[in-house]
Amino acid sequence: MSTKAWNASRLSGPDPSTPWSLKKPLQHGSRPPKGKRLTVCPPTRPKQTIRISASHASQQLDQAKAACLAVTIRDLEEATAVMRSWEHSLVTPQCIAPRYSIIMFMITAVKRLRESKMLTLSWFNQALMMVSKSGEEMRNLRTAMWILANLIPREVLPLTGDLLPSLQQQEPPMLKQ
């Protein structure tokens, strides 16, 4: 044990935690002694560049586009449901055989997009063959597909198949010929 006692009011001996440079009083005009500074830094790894392959980046882009397409399809479903209720409130049943309107074709196409995520030219040709007896329904089908092609953002349009990108580049179809 040490013979020197520590007192809270004054020190009876040197403080062991005081650095050596502060233990000796400095003379007027002199500089503190230059000692070797020991800076202990933990060893660090060199910075590494994170590399992302082109296929991984394109895969992430495709996933983002697919998510955007899913949101667009959901929004189109909601919009066509509103348009359908609006159309039914305005139109009274006048004939026995109901005809497909532009809105009905849009609803059918959006349902197909939701189920299979694709609208192909072969599907469009089959639909045209089914309504080939009615010139009005053919125009309605073309108009509905053209409207859909222009409602879906261009970035995700190629994900919908080959029909809508080809229709988007065309002129708007005439409603009455």
Curated annotation (Swiss-Prot):
Biased composition (Polar residues): 1-10
Family: Belongs to the morbillivirus protein C family.
InterPro entries: Paramyxovir_NSC
Native organism: Rinderpest virus (strain Kabete O)
Transmembrane domains' residue ranges: none
Region Disordered, annotated ranges: 1-37
Recorded superkingdom: Viruses
Protein name according to UniProt: Protein C
